[in-house]
Amino acid sequence: MKKKQLFLLHFAGGSIYSFEFLRSHYIDFEMVPVELPGRGKRVKEKLLTSYKEAINDIFSQITDKLNGEPFIIYGHSLGSSLGLGVTDLLEKNNTPPQCLIVSGNAGPGLIPSTKRSDLERADFIAMLNELGGLPEELLQSDELLDFVIPILRADFEIVEEHFYAENIIVNAPIVAVMGNLEKYVDQINNWKKHTLSEFKPYVLKGHHFFIHNNVEQLIEIFDTSFNDCASLK
């Protein structure tokens, strides 16, 4: 039997493996992680630095994997920004998601337009630590840093084209989730202006990667949001 689908859009520097932590819990969805080129299973492909190219790439992956059942788009951080653009493309393609769930991101237009992707290596690493921290094992390995920093720089270039997303308004309901210690958590309602439908915010405990410590709550939000959005159809 086909299951409803949950498409997972990773954060900057992430890949299809970024949501493996969800698999240790029962989840009533077919989980379908997608990834940008240059990492994970697509490591040999050229990195993208354009917002439009990125959302078109993800849109193509999703349309290829739709099973005909209702589905949700979920993105964390960078994935949230991309999720908005992808939802817009899906709606224009007459294959709309049940809803868009975003986390770790208060929406387009809030982050200063400074060019962070071009920072010197030490400053770039310091900025990443300030935003949400890097794993200690990554900081201790120049080899790992050499591999991941070009990916992160490319992903930040995509983020820096956020002006493309600032005027996007979708028909799908939007559910926004942030950690109570995140920098822009008090502006979570910024997402409300990007939907013509319902909007619901959640604030959980934690910093930028609060999703790893709130798995059960996150899955509950997936289930509740799916059911609530289904009732709006």
Description of each model-found segment:
Residues 1-233:
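Non-catalytic, mobile gating and regulatory segments of ester bond hydrolases
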